[in-house]
């Protein structure tokens, strides 16, 4: 049965003081970035922004006109520059998210983005083989070492150093910006495992968290040379679990947020789905349940996880559906209180979230259109 008692509050419109002070630190350390100066976003409607945790969204000049997903969205270290992937389009903004223009057509209709240093990013197809490097407005197609990519990580200290993970749990390493690759370390769960995700620590490529089908989670801190099985994903000792997604907090490498299912709890005829959000404070070795799948906090197997870049206690996640024109809930979990705040908008979903490097209270949202509304 689902555990009860998660407190859900109404629209959260302020950022806690601790995060405000951290945001000031971020502004000091982020050269050239500023908050968007516009009140309306010029673009096709794929990206908007909010300054109040989603209580209000900046209107857009365009409206999404077809089934659309914006899976890729990153803020670069080039001042005021962001990239987004809307279906097979690569879009770019150079004014902190006020204006978006198409710069290229990509070789996949569904691509994620991982930012690198020097104004670079990598575009990649989740559970597919498409891979490209984006330098400014130039897109260079790369050969992926895996036909089923489940994660890409970059090195802040070495611009050309990038890692990639395949759905078998194998890591690959490149020191020439993705031109060539070599296998690295051992399989995350051994031969025959199906891996949903590998999340790389943005501060340390050697630290990565893997999630698998029935195998739960695993973590490496030595670039895949060794992997340690995670505990706490099932309430039953030795119980199996699925770990669909994980994200290492940019604010504290010891904090990892994850999405999974306790397969013991979700056993046939149990009446429970066993779906939860989890939090680890030891880098992904042990997890504690923090949010259950309830009518107040809806979770799916693909719930988006977006940890705050400045506050390791804060996680944003979302639930959206076109069914009965429900719209989208944007949630904010705070580990200090265990409470979840919620705001609502009319869009069909949020596919991606990025944060303004100088003003982390400015959140950029990649939007979905699943059913055209007339």
From Swiss-Prot:
Gene3D superfamilies: YVTN repeat-like/Quinoprotein amine dehydrogenase. InterPro entries: WD40/YVTN_repeat-like_dom_sf. Residues 1-26 form the signal peptide. GO terms for cellular component: extracellular region. The keyword Signal applies. It is found in: Secreted. The keyword Acetylation does not apply. Keywords: Secreted, Signal. On the 2D-gel the determined pI of this protein is: 7.1, its MW is: 39 kDa. Induces autolysis of dispase and thermolysin. This is Dispase autolysis-inducing protein. It comes from Streptomyces mobaraensis. The lineage of its organism: Bacteria, Bacillati, Actinomycetota, Actinomycetes, Kitasatosporales.
């Amino acid at each position: 049965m689902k555990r009860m008692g998660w407190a859900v509050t109404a629209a959260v419109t302020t950022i806690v003081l601790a995060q405000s002070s951290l945001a000031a630190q971020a502004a000091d350390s982020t050269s050239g970035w500023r908050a968007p100066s516009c009140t309306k976003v010029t673009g096709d409607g794929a990206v908007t922004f909010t300054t109040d945790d989603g209580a209000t969204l900046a209107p857009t000049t365009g409206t999404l006109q077809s089934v659309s997903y914006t899976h890729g969205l990153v803020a670069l270290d080039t001042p005021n520059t962001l990239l987004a992937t809307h279906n097979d389009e690569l879009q770019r903004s150079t004014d902190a998210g006020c204006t978006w223009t198409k710069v290229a057509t990509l070789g996949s209709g569904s691509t994620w983005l991982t930012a690198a240093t020097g104004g670079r990013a990598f575009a990649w197809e989740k559970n597919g083989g498409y891979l490209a490097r984006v330098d400014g407005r130039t897109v260079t197609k790369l050969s992926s070492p895996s036909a089923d990519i489940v994660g890409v990580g970059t090195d802040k200290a070495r611009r050309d150093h990038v890692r990639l993970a395949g759905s078998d749990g194998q890591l690959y390493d490149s020191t020439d910006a993705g031109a060539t690759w070599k296998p690295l370390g051992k399989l995350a769960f051994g031969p025959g495992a199906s891996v949903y995700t590998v999340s790389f620590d943005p501060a340390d490529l050697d630290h990565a968290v893997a999630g698998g089908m029935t195998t739960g989670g695993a973590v490496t801190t030595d670039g895949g040379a060794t992997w340690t099985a995670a505990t706490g994903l099932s309430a039953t000792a030795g119980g199996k679990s699925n770990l669909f997604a994980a994200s290492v907090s940019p604010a504290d490498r010891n904090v990892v947020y994850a999405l999974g299912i306790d397969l013991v709890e979700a056993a046939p005829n149990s009446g429970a789905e066993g779906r939860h959000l989890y939090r680890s404070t030891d880098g992904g070795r042990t997890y504690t349940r923090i949010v259950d799948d309830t009518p107040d906090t809806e979770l799916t197997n693909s719930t988006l996880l977006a940890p705050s870049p400045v506050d390791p206690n804060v996680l944003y996640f979302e639930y959206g559906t076109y069914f009965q024109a429900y719209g989208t809930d944007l949630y904010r979990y705070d580990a200090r209180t265990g409470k979840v705040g919620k705001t609502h908008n009319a869009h069909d979903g949020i596919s991606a979230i990025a944060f303004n490097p100088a003003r982390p209270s400015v959140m950029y949202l990649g939007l979905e259109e699943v059913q055209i509304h007339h």
